[in-house]
A protein has these predicted regions:
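Ribokinase/PfkB-type carbohydrate-kinase core domain
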Residues: 1-63, 72-182
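Short beta-alpha connecting loops at secondary-structure transitions
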Residues: 68-70
Length: 182
């Protein structure tokens, strides 16, 4: 009897995995991953502080047409470019991250504490906006997102900050050549 009835994967996924298994063996995959170790990678992008606030519904509000929720707990993660830098640093020894933080409530301590030791971060601070924070409110039992609030300024940075960022890139590129920029 086939285990197709018990598989958690779709037919397309099972077919892909079968073809992948025929083409690559474990040792070649391990060698290719180990070959990434000496790459120098520069990551440029938006770091995001991801907050998940778990709650449970209590019922309908008597004063408004909304559902009232009881707060239970929260988790905070380094997301966006912060997460990418951490993932890449698990494969490559040298990773540099360039990103913007907000001047007010920068969350710099949290971000720095949650980057892997081999991630060298260069933060630029924008005066006109916060560090990007995404607060998601999630039903504790079903894990369904109820709503999300984003703290973000998605307008262009001002000319002075742009000049600082460009000057920084012009100063590091010749001195520390990167194999890849993400």
């Amino acid at each position: 009897m086939s285990d197709n009835f018990l598989s958690t994967y779709s037919v397309e996924t099972r077919d892909f995995l079968a073809r992948f298994n025929e083409k690559y063996d474990f040792n070649s995959i391990r060698k290719n991953l180990n070959d990434l170790k000496d790459l120098k990678v520069l990551i440029v992008g938006d770091g995001i502080v991801d907050e998940y606030h778990y709650c449970e519904p209590m019922g309908k509000s008597a004063k408004a047409n909304i559902i009232v929720n009881r707060y239970l707990e929260n988790e905070v993660f380094a997301g966006g470019a912060f997460a990418i830098a951490n993932h890449v640093s698990s494969l490559c020894d040298e990773v540099q991250l360039v990103t913007l933080l907000g001047k007010e409530n920068s969350r710099e301590d949290f971000v720095s504490a949650n980057l892997n030791p081999n991630v060298e971060a260069k933060f630029f601070f924008r005066e006109d906006g916060p560090t990007i924070v995404k607060k998601r409110y999630v039903h504790n039992y079903s894990n369904q997102k109820l709503f999300e609030i984003n703290f973000i300024n998605d307008r262009f940075i001002d000319e002075d900050l742009e000049a600082k960022v460009i000057d920084y890139f012009e100063s590091i590129i010749p001195l520390a050549p990167c194999h890849h920029v993400l």
